[in-house]
Amino acid sequence: MFRFLALLIVCNTGLSAQLNPDKTGFIPVTLKDQKLGNIQYYHSKKDAESKKALLLYLDGSGPYPIFQYMAQGYGSTIPFDLKKAMKDFHVVLISKPGVPFADSVRRDPETGYPEYREPQEYTQRLSLDWRVEAAEKVLRDVTKRVNADRNKISILGFSEGFQVGTALLARSKLVTHAVLMVGNGFTQFFDFIIQNRQEAICGKITHQEAQIRIDSLHKVFREIRADPTSTEKHWFGHTYLRWSSFASLEPFKILSRVKIPVYLVAATADENTSVLGLDYLRLKTELAGQTSIRFHPVP
């Protein structure tokens, strides 16, 4: 996995009180929407009246709070220094549906992965459509609350946020710059197929075993497509609703047409999110003479 961006960035701190938006430098805002329910977002309060660039961060997958209490202090799903960012940007964060701003999160002692009980609202609502529509509404609202430079409205999407950011570019004319990190070029389903083919090529499994696995994957994909709005059925830790919505997106189709500057970061050694899709996107844009996308591969 992309080492530079750890899932949790541990902040050694003396804070013993419960974290809240104010103590971390944010102003909370709740948007009430008939379709999406409550959209909870936060914008930095530092120099809110000063004209400067705006940065909307779109985090990765999972029902995790933005800030997470741990034994050694607290962690965050934010992969950059907030204090530094707030000097130059109006920073904007969005909670996923039903997920609190901060809460205690356990970590599996063997794998180190976070363990957190999924809120019911998250289960019922989380989809690509929810995240993209919520982000679009937040951008429209926050640009009325802070003095944002309309020529410098950026998004930073990581992992699942890569997909969200890509889809947002197809909808919102407010975004002027984008950084998209560790995401897919094709549908997310294709990564599972690529992974098995690569394991066969590398000799980890036989080609026959790979084909059996891939045939099983196609069976699952058909089941998801047959019940695309189900929040009762799960696969790989996510509802069918979540999978069907995100798998419907093929980022290369959008990114190969965008005109704004986009900086793509690809993790070349990531086995879960294949770099091949972004390699294809890079080739496609270069053949088309597109110059707005920069491609940055990292181990």
What is the predicted function of each stretch?
Residues 18-50:
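N-terminal cap/lid segment of alpha/beta-hydrolase-fold proteins
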Residues 141-145, 150-198:
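Primarily recognizes the serine-hydrolase "nucleophile elbow" in alpha/beta-hydrolase
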Residues 113, 125, 179-257:
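Accessory cap/linker subdomain of secreted extracellular hydrolases
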Residues 105-145:
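Alpha/beta-hydrolase active-site loop
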Residues 271-280:
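Conserved alpha/beta-hydrolase "acid-adjacent" motif
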Residues 258, 264-266:
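Short beta-strand/loop motif that positions the catalytic acidic residue
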Residues 48-88, 100, 104:
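Short, surface-exposed "cap/lid" segments of acyl-processing enzymes
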Residues 286-299:
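Catalytic histidine neighborhood in serine/cysteine hydrolases
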